[in-house]
Amino acid sequence: SGPCGPCSEIYYDRGEKYGNGPEDVMGGEGDRFMEVWNIVFSQFNNDGNGNYTDLVQKNIDTGMGLERLAVAVQDVGSIFDVDTLKSLRDLICSLAGGIGYEQPGSYDSDVSVRICTDHARAMTFMISDGIMPSNNGRGYVLRRIIRRAVRHGRKLGIQGSFLPTLAENVIETSKDGYPELEEKRDFILNVVRAEEEKFEKTYEQGMDILAQMEQELEKAGNKELSGEDAFKLYDTYGFPLDNTKEILEEKGFTVDEDGFNAAMKKQREQAR
């Protein structure tokens, strides 16, 4: 419901070196054509029931992907190769023992490298904007980002505290355009360090408990973790639900989300 209208996408042809197969068409799954701009001609209001009326004031809503444009201008493979992110990506590979990136057989580690890269920048800017890790709202989004980055760092073999090092890189590479990062450097690093250490205290134990739960599911021929067990991981070991889901999905399991939400609701009612 709300303002809407026809839309148009602008694609950039990156050339045959990025693909020349049947999937390499505008709007396809290939890498050759990259959408860099989206335009919506807002001229109708949808009442939510499929009824459209003309807007009194029509407008054009447009948005360009800045780093997608950088991908095109710098002629690189993805946003993780542009100058604003490459040094952070390379730092993560170095901390992981000098692993290769986009090498034969490196798909799984590439995913973890990209997640750590993306999440490190996101957490740094969120904290700079005054968002603090918590169990509610934006604060919980930040907490989930940090904890997911920790997990993927461990998947890469990075041991010990590493997120403050990544935040330092983000600050150094972005401070010219965002001077507030330098002004809040110590604050950002202290928040990241404290949140990482807090999760570290329960992470390994929680992973062991989850592994035991997986074994029990295998023995029972069950592919779904109960909501109660997922809530235990959240409540006792600090595992966000999406973290647990991601770990289990990698191994072919699912989570009873309705059961998790019911357990969460029950605890909140008891706490009143």
Residue ranges of each PLM-predicted region?
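A glycine- and charged-residue-rich anion-binding loop/surface
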Residues: 1-272
